[in-house]
Amino acid sequence: MVTPKIAAVATATPRWRYDQATVLRMSGYDDPRRMGFFSNSLIETRHLYMDPETFTPDESVDQLNERWRRGAVEVGTAAVARAIERAGWRHEDVDFLATTTCTGRVCPSLDAQIIKELGLRSTVQRVHVGDTGCASAMVAMQQVSNHVRAFPEHRAVMVAVEICSAAYFLDDRLESAVAHAIFADGAGAIAISGDGTGPEIVEHRTIFRSEHLGAMGFEYPGGRPRVVLSKDVRRIGAGMMKEMADALMAGNGLKTEDIGHFVLHSAGRRVIEQVGKVMSLDEARLAHSRHVLQQYGNMSSATVVFVLDDLLRSGEPAPGDWGLMIALGPGFAAEGALLRW
């Protein structure tokens, strides 16, 4: 059986880049606790699909949805186009496209929008993965990997695109303030085939802990998205990242010292710190997750693809190296993959 391989990774962001001080001013917070969410986040800059010349914080639900649609199609299409180009493919070479997002929805679905924008074949197969939160890039990546295992001659692309700036909610909840302090916009795409030149995707795995179902997600008062984010997420998430890492390693006869690279979702400063503690990882092994958080913020599902791209750009992986790629999402769920260069 063919082992799927990563042929290329690409990312895209909105054209507008904001520093934390600017976003804090836009949020209107003036109490020390909420201001601290911004200053203690480790984040320096974020890209947001918000034109500073026209944005106002009193958007209607319809205006939010339209901004999400424009941003998701624009940024998602850019990421897919770059991944296809980096893989050395033509647009008509793509046999399968998987799209995913949790910050908005459109019908016809996001995959149909991108197929039209890029002029992909009319026979391209596709699937859209929705509402699996920050872990959804890994869920979509698994669908693409499974497709390539079943059809080894096919060339497939996964794209995770999030416009988190279209999911803000102005109220007095601390959860909302945390969301405003960390979430950002971006898209990450991965091209996968049976003959790619990048790392092999050796195994995918999912772990659910339904007792934490309400710890993270969205609710929709008045039709407007509002983040649900329990303070327990950093504890739950770190523990589940370790559980996922242990499961992937044990199933393949590996130990922590055998893993050369950790591609971990940049959920937030405290989550990264807690992961380092429970998994006994030094700063060097968390460097790419920290760097992405610092420069881009938490882009929900797209973030882990940015971390993978950051690692690949560093040139650190060598033939024979093992890597773990793990993200967290509502459910509560950990989604992971074992990679081999």
Task: Go through each PLM region and give its residues.
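Short beta-strand segments
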Residues: A7-A10, T100, G130, V157-E162, ...
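Condensing-enzyme catalytic core mediating Claisen C-C bond formation in acyl metabolism
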Residues: M1-R70, L170-G239, E243-A247, L328, ...
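Short acidic, glycine/serine/threonine-rich loops at helix termini
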Residues: Y18, P108-A112, V139-Q142, A167-D172, ...
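Acidic-glycine-rich active-site phosphate/pyrophosphate-binding loop
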Residues: V106-L120, V159-L170, G214-F218, I272-L286
